[in-house]
Amino acid sequence: MVRISFIGDISLNDNYIKLRNQGINPFESLRHILFSSDFVVGNLECMVKGNQGVNEKKRPRLETKIETLNYLKNINLSLAGLANNHIYDHLEDGFYRTTNFLKENKIAFIGASLKNDEYKNPAYFEKDGIKVVILNYVSLDTNPYPPKEINIRVNYFKEEKVIEDIKRLRNKVDHIILYLHWGGRLEGGLYPDFEQPKIGRRLIDAGADLIIGHHSHTVQPFEIYKGKYIFYSLGNFCF
């Protein structure tokens, strides 16, 4: 059996920076859950501030500090999803500093890359002969607002392409999980928009085994369709 813990949106700014400076670990009570999981997956929405300025097209912007990113080790994060609407907030230098920290601390990331096509690559987990793949996408309705001439490459959600990815992987792994930053038309809403259930069911029909959604910053309902779970939004983990 493979145990994967999915947590919601992560933004280690403001109060988390203060707590880190005070030497406080606000996640200690979750340690027994997160450190007993084989893998922990979260949507990382805060980039480290860089030297190139900020994405003036985007409001609000999220940011953190390198020191505060150390909290990711306190939650045993295995994989950071970067396909989200805050990935451009601190331009290329902020992206580089953030992903360099992840690499140095052996935290994998998917959904975005700098100047190359690695943003398209899924993440693979395997334990006891069970193979799991996770694919990460962001929908345009979440308003990422990419700056002009930016070299950050992001895995945007296009249903036809996602279905192609599912079918390409279907016979190579045991479980396909879609990790979706979506539902921008109802950000802050308690329910998915009218299109999301239709899309989610089509993706299950195409061969996905589980859909994990985020972006709304609220916990939204889930459904079981043909025996497969669709979680429309996990809400915030720390924000």
Locations of regions flagged by a protein language model:
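Acidic, metal/ion-coordinating pockets
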Residues: 1-239
